[in-house]
Amino acid sequence: AFELTQTPASVEAAVGGTVTINCQASESISNWLAWYQQKPGQPXKLLIYKASTLASGVSSRFKGSGSGTQFTLTISDLECADAATYYCQSTD
């Protein structure tokens, strides 16, 4: 069965720092991957689609990269407001 594996499970970082979240697909999905941000009590927010395309209104501090089976979300210049759950999702 198709699976997406995200690492690390959790991360701590300082304001102004950078974090990287990885997503590995069990089979190639080309660039059909999206990244979402989820905060408690709020709907999920689309950050990145097609692996690297920034969604409308999303800060350029968020960067998506990768293709095939390996993908990365990088958040730079961290702000307190970035505290959230982030997840990847296949859009194929």
UniProtKB/Swiss-Prot annotation:
GO biological process assignments: adaptive immune response
Q: Which InterPro entries does the entry link to?
A: Ig-like_dom (IPR007110), Ig-like_dom_sf (IPR036179), Ig-like_fold (IPR013783), Ig_V-set (IPR013106), IgV_Light_Chain (IPR050150)
Query: What Gene3D superfamilies does the annotation carry?
Result: Immunoglobulins (2.60.40.10)
Annotated region Complementarity-determining-3: where?
89-92
Q: Where is this region: Complementarity-determining-2?
A: 50-56
Keywords from UniProt, A to Z, are: Adaptive immunity, Immunity, Immunoglobulin
Region (Complementarity-determining-1), start-end ranges: 24-34
The organism sits in which domain of life?
A: Eukaryota
Question: Cellular component terms, GO, for this chain's entry?
Answer: immunoglobulin complex
Q: Where is this region: Framework-1?
A: 1-23
Q: Where is this region: Framework-3?
A: 57-88
Q: Where is this region: Framework-2?
A: 35-49
The signal peptide, as residue positions, is none
Q: Which PROSITE patterns match?
A: IG_LIKE
User: What further fact does the record state?
Assistant: This chain was obtained from antibody to type III pneumococci and was isolated from the serum of a single rabbit.
Can you name this protein? Ig kappa chain V region 3381
Source species, please?
A: Oryctolagus cuniculus
